[in-house]
Amino acid sequence: VLVHLAAAGVSERGDGNLEEILEVNVIKSLKLLLNALSNKCKNFLIVSTSSEYGKNTFDTKTLSKKSKINPFTNYGISKAIFSNLLNELSKNYNCKIRLMKLFPVYGKGEHSNRLLPSLRRAAKRGKNFIVKNPSEIRDFTSVDYVSKVLIDASNFKKRKFKNFQIYHISENNPITVEEFAKKYWKIYKTKGRLILKNRRRLYTRHVSNKSSVWKVS
């Protein structure tokens, strides 16, 4: 089984250089799979993102693995292109591709500019922290849980399928960004305070329905 996690352009905004993002997320990733196929590897576990659903996250309460993809960030666009190519590749080469779409992940090793590391840094310095999207609802999922799911999903004897299969990786416990921030702000016992902005603004909802989530067995 080849497990593919490589990605460029992963950030809070997902709007890095499109050419560079496509080079890694589509062109080089496709070459990797073709090389593996030429060496008789037929099982692939590919990690993607809920950002593929894009604009649908504005008006859909929960996302299904059958939801239409409609990305609007460069990162989301690149991953959607690659996912579509994977579907065709699985049929043309009669291989098995299991696509795992990650919902918002936090924990050890994440980029220093993301929400939790930024919040932790401000808390340790005793400074105030601005939450710009407090009303946004996300399926916050710990990296430890993601690891358990990927190990379990790499067993292709589970949930057998013919060529192409999609599942979500999510702890399925949606909360607002405000609730998430307050939880960790309290843990860090900081002297600073949280400043909440744009509370009435329309935000995306990165929330999976229960039936689309891979359950560890």
Where do the model's predicted regions map?
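SDR active-site strand-loop-helix element
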Residues: 2-8, 44-50, 100-102
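Conserved Rossmann-fold NAD(P)-dependent oxidoreductase catalytic core, especially the SDR/UDP-sugar
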Residues: 30-74
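Conserved catalytic-core motifs of eukaryotic protein kinase domains, centered on the activation segment
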Residues: 12-20, 55-61, 111-112
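Glycine-rich NAD(P)-binding loop of the Rossmann-fold in SDR/ketoreductase-type enzymes
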Residues: 16, 20-31, 69, 73, ...
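C-terminal substrate-binding subdomain of Rossmann-fold SDR/epimerase-dehydratase oxidoreductases
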Residues: 123-217
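NAD(P)H-binding glycine-rich loop region in Rossmannoid oxidoreductase-like domains
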Residues: 1-24
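Flexible, glycine-rich beta-alpha linker
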Residues: 53-54, 70-74, 98-115
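Active-site Tyr-X1-5-Lys
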Residues: 58, 70-98, 123-124
